[in-house]
């Protein structure tokens, strides 16, 4: 079980990413546009650097929805491998069963 502070930190990051998503996208569009002047590009870079560090989507970490475990996370189910196996063995995941050949 992950510490509740780690779960809270991830929730805070998700909120910041959502809050600054449009602003980040606009600044990146200015930076990546080849017709933008050097001064405008530099201003956009400085503004982008001025945004909170945690507002970048790359700083988010996928975590198990039940335990908060950061490793062994399966995107398709939103669970860690351990909790997915437990749910599968109980028959709670439709269409998923233990492999046998």
Swiss-Prot record:
UniProt keywords, alphabetically: Ribonucleoprotein, Ribosomal protein, RNA-binding, rRNA-binding
Gene Ontology terms: biological process: translation
GO CC term (a single one): small ribosomal subunit
MF terms in GO: rRNA binding; structural constituent of ribosome
SUPFAM superfamilies reported for this sequence: Glucocorticoid receptor-like (DNA-binding domain)
Record InterPro entries: Ribosomal_uS14 (IPR001209), Ribosomal_uS14_bac/plastid (IPR023036), Ribosomal_uS14_CS (IPR018271)
Highest rank taxon of the organism: Bacteria
Family listed: Belongs to the universal ribosomal protein uS14 family.
Record's subunit section: Part of the 30S ribosomal subunit. Contacts proteins S3 and S10.
Function: Binds 16S rRNA, required for the assembly of 30S particles and may also be responsible for determining the conformation of the 16S rRNA at the A site.
PANTHER family with a match to the protein in the record: 30S RIBOSOMAL PROTEIN S14, SMALL RIBOSOMAL SUBUNIT PROTEIN US14M
The protein, known as: Small ribosomal subunit protein uS14
Organism this protein belongs to: Shewanella sediminis (strain HAW-EB3)
